[in-house]
Regions:
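Residue-level detector of alpha-helix initiation sites
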Residues: 23-24, 80-81, 127
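Hydrophobic, well-ordered beta-alpha structural blocks that scaffold small-molecule cofactor pockets
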Residues: 1-45, 50-52, 59-60
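Short amphipathic alpha-helix with an adjacent loop that forms part of the alpha/beta core around
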Residues: 61-69
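Short basic, glycine-rich beta-strand/loop surfaces that mediate nucleic-acid
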Residues: 71-77, 107-128
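Alpha-helix C-terminal capping/helix-to-coil transition sites in glycosyltransferase folds
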Residues: 12-13, 68-70
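ADP-ribose/adenylate-binding Rossmann-like module
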Residues: 72-76, 83-109
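An accessory alpha-helical subdomain
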Residues: 11, 125-161
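Hydrophobic beta-strand scaffold residues
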Residues: 39, 57, 94-97
Length: 161
């Protein structure tokens, strides 16, 4: 059974790569854009929407050297064999890899995220029930104003001890 440790990773100044310019790659890139404006997306073709993101778009087929100097890579192609090869290339270079839709190959997964100002709420299911994670994240988002308004009660209790 897969077991993922929920952590926050400092990506400041780190090289992040997304391989794949389709629907899944665009989804990952859109989320990533909330946290950084520095990433490179590699794909022979790009779905509409990529041009609105702050990332460098490289229109070409993947090559192993694309991972040189990278910190992490999101592998989002529609070719399962290519995804496995990119994962092997990442391992050989010590690059953390997330293979979209293949959690058994992932070094990390991305939780369902809600972010407001400097607060980030992440809900994960160890890649077993993504839709449930998203539903819980949505419930938190939909009730956030109420929760935030009452958080001062929790803060005052915390500071008393």
């Amino acid at each position: 059974m897969l077991s993922f440790l929920p952590i926050n990773i400092n990506i400041e100044g780190r090289r992040i790569i997304i391989v794949g310019g389709g629907r899944v790659g665009l989804h990952k890139a859109t989320i990533l854009a909330r946290f950084t404006d520095r990433a490179t997306v590699i794909s022979p073709e790009f779905r509409e929407g990529f041009s609105q993101l702050p990332f460098t778009l490289v229109r070409k087929h993947y090559e192993p050297s694309d991972l040189d100097g990278a910190f992490l890579v999101y592998i989002c192609t529609e070719d399962a064999l290519l995804n496995r090869q990119i994962k092997r290339d990442a391992e050989a270079r010590g690059v953390l890899a997330s293979v979209c839709d293949s959690p058994e190959l992932c070094d990390f997964t991305s939780p369902a995220i809600f972010r407001k100002d400097n607060l980030t709420v992440a809900v994960a299911s160890d890649a077993r029930d993504v839709h449930r994670s998203m539903s819980i994240r949505d419930a938190i988002r939909d009730n956030f104003d109420y929760l935030e308004a009452h958080s001062h009660d929790a803060r005052s209790l915390y500071h008393k001890h």
